Amino acid sequence: MSYLQDDKPVTLFELGKMRAEGRKIAMLTCYDASFAALLERNGVDVLLVGDSLGNVLQGQKSTLPVTLEQMAYHTECVVRGSSRPFVVTDMPFGSYQESPEQAMRNAARLMAAGAEMVKLEGGAFMAETVRFLVERGVPVCAHIGLTPQSVHQLGGYRVQGRSEEGAARLKADALALEQAGAALVVLEMVPAAVASDITRSLSTMATIGIGAGADCSGQVLVLHDMIGVYPGKKARFVKNFMEGAASIDAAVAAYVAAVKDGSFPAAEHCY
């Protein structure tokens, strides 16, 4: 079976162009070759090999137990199944927090597995590490707001940036990460007005929202959430695109269309 597509690959340059032109970026998590091919043929721009695999594939209560080798393995699977989408891989907990050198060593492992960018969590305090990686040829996606690897420190899965002080801190984090060279930043569970202000304040870095309103440069959801395969209570920012869809292909195509035309997220998915 060949998964190869004729479409021109999405590059970091193209993502920057999309941001500048106001064209929305559609991202979904992906963990294997079959879904990588499915997401590709339905127009997903970016595949995020997320450490959320700990939750949705392994049944873990958090992302913390996920290992670097597991992330590399799933990256290899996704890359085999796709050719057009840009592939971003999460750096798992404990693989980058110690030092920029540790981050570089482990980012190199993920890049060798096929990642085109690595994602790491944290605000301005991670700027030194981001700069270290970017200067050495590793594109970086930052992640602020609700950062799942810090769930215990944050006291659970809570909206971040509700207070004036919290909103100002998130904006300062985003600006510091942009200055350090991050090309993308995920804004998770952030009030829509705060995410909109952050997006407008940035010069080059694209914002990818998950529970952060419709004004971000793009959107991301966990694949399993988007197709209604999730245990327990559905998060407010999730829409089940399988409802009314004839197939998973149709659901993914509907998600991409809704992101592109700005109809997702709607008000009921925002904080």
Curated annotation (Swiss-Prot):
Entry annotated with the keyword Signal: no
- The membrane spanning regions, by residue number, are none
Q: Describe cofactor binding as the record notes it.
A: Binds 1 Mg(2+) ion per subunit.
Q: Which Gene3D superfamilies match?
A: Phosphoenolpyruvate-binding domains
**Ligand binding (Mg(2+)):** 51, 90, 121
> What chemistry does it catalyse, as a reaction equation?
3-methyl-2-oxobutanoate + (6R)-5,10-methylene-5,6,7,8-tetrahydrofolate + H2O = 2-dehydropantoate + (6S)-5,6,7,8-tetrahydrofolate
Q: Which GO terms describe its molecular function?
A: 3-methyl-2-oxobutanoate hydroxymethyltransferase activity; magnesium ion binding
Compartment annotation = Cytoplasm
UniProt xrefs under InterPro entries? Pantoate_hydroxy_MeTrfase, Pyrv/PenolPyrv_kinase-like_dom, Pyrv_kinase-like_dom_sf
* Involved pathway(s): Cofactor biosynthesis; (R)-pantothenate biosynthesis; (R)-pantoate from 3-methyl-2-oxobutanoate: step 1/2
Which keywords belong to this entry? Cytoplasm, Magnesium, Metal-binding, Pantothenate biosynthesis, Transferase
Q: How does it assemble?
A: Homodecamer; pentamer of dimers.
Recorded protein name is 3-methyl-2-oxobutanoate hydroxymethyltransferase
In its UniProt entry, the species of origin is given as: Azoarcus sp. (strain BH72)
